[in-house]
Regions:
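Active-site neighborhoods and metal-handling regions in enzymes and metal-associated proteins
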Residues: 1-405
Length: 405
């Protein structure tokens, strides 16, 4: 599985004339290697063959002192980390060459690997030669990095490897992750099912006098009891006037009769995130509140019916946004309609006016329109949806009709 993902990454990088890729975010480390530990750097040299080569027989005792061994020149896939994770790498990533950090930082090890790979690199990537067949110091690699790379690491790499160019290549790195395989879809569906169960559970808990913090904690405890490892983001419980803030912080405000309460929450199950939002009423809502709720629900449903393979993301956003505007509330829907979900809670692509990515089958994206009337109340309804060839599959199954408690 991980080798197949690296093959796709390798092909994406070849098409963009990159000679190597360096990753350090936990989600990308896991996606491309299976490593679930902490600090590490993944370095892969791009190969014109289908599969970048690695020789794990050299894992034992490999450090900066012997990193110039001849055999390193033919390896193309490395994971650099310290002694806290040696055993973990060997168990989780048996097909990756482990570089054991000891007395130097990541940038020094990357520098050595780049220098030692030069001879082999010339043959497969002649375009990387800056000056006709000169020594290795005259070579420059174009190395793809994430847009989330820590600035300190980026500066250290740039200083240690001045003859190389580190280029943000978000599209090449994230393209594979946008399309989920069957195992990923099943895991995300299970994570979302935990969220659905949490919503059903929390309804019996909600009544006047209970605080937003009480509700948020109960949701978290319930999801963890159902097998979630952690929250996928800080739970939002926004009641009364707080619900007009899309990302309100949880407070000790007590629920009151006449409140709308918006709950946006999710969990991580076996590494993958869920995300859902529901708005409920405490006591009988006003006519205006019911009207706004129905507009948001209709926008959610209209957008969902537009979801299918081959549609631009901004066109789907426009369906919901245009409908809300036609009902007179266009100024009160300020955020994008949705975002990708997977190993991270916010992934590509996005349902937003700026995103012209064309949807592909098995993308997992949220559909979450909202209307927010400052200082009064707000409504958001969010489902998690899988893009299909001729439509969609909804992973969120909680009731979306207005629930009055």
């Amino acid at each position: 599985m991980f080798q197949t993902r690296r093959q796709r990454l390798n092909q994406n990088l070849l098409e963009k004339n990159m000679q190597a890729v360096l990753l350090d975010s936990p989600s990308n480390l896991y996606y491309y290697t299976g490593f679930t530990g902490g600090e590490a750097v993944f370095l892969m040299f791009v190969s014109e063959q289908d599969t970048p080569k690695t020789d794990c027989s050299i894992n034992q005792g490999l450090d900066s002192g012997n990193a110039k061994e001849e055999q390193l020149k033919t390896n193309q896939v490395y994971l650099i980390t310290d002694s806290r994770y040696y055993e973990q790498v060997e168990k989780e990533c048996p097909d990756i060459t482990l570089i054991r950090m000891e007395n130097q930082g990541f940038s020094e090890y990357v520098k050595e690997l780049l220098e030692n790979y030069d001879d082999n690199f010339n043959e497969s990537h002649p375009q990387s030669i800056v000056s006709n067949s000169k020594k290795s110091k005259e070579l420059m690699y174009t190395i793809a990095v994430e847009d989330t790379m820590n600035l300190e690491l980026y500066l250290k790499l740039s200083n240690a490897c001045p003859d190389n160019q580190f280029v943000i290549a978000k599209d090449a790195i994230m393209e594979s992750r946008m399309i989920k395989d069957e195992a990923e879809l099943q895991t995300i569906a299970k994570a979302e099912a935990i969220g659905d169960a949490a919503f059903t559970h929390i309804l019996d808990y909600m009544k006047p006098g209970v605080t937003e913090a009480d509700i948020a904690l109960e949701i978290e405890f319930f999801m963890k009891r159902q097998g979630a490892s952690k929250l996928s983001f800080d739970t939002i419980v926004a009641s009364g006037p707080n619900s007009s803030m899309p990302h309100a912080q949880v407070t000790n405000r007590k629920l009151q009769m006449g409140d709308f309460v918006t709950m946006d929450f999710g969990c991580v199950y076996q590494g993958y995130c869920s995300d859902m939002t529901r708005t409920v009423a405490i006591g009988e809502p006003t006519e205006e509140m019911r009207k706004v709720y129905q507009i948001v629900l209709d926008a959610n449903l209209r957008a969902m019916e537009a979801i299918r393979k081959g549609v631009k993301c901004n066109e789907i956003d426009a369906v919901a946004r245009g409908y809300i505007k036609s009902q007179g509330y266009g100024d009160y829907f300020g955020h994008g309609l949705g975002h990708g979900v997977g190993l991270d809670i916010h992934e590509e692509p996005r349902f937003s006016p700026k995103c012209d990515v064309i949807t592909k089958e098995n993308m997992v994206i949220t559909d979450e329109p909202g209307i927010y009337l400052p200082g009064r109340f707000g409504v958001r309804i969010e489902d998690l949806v899988v893009v299909k060839k001729d439509g969609y599959e909804k992973l969120s199954h909680s009731d979306k009709q207005l629930i009055v408690l």
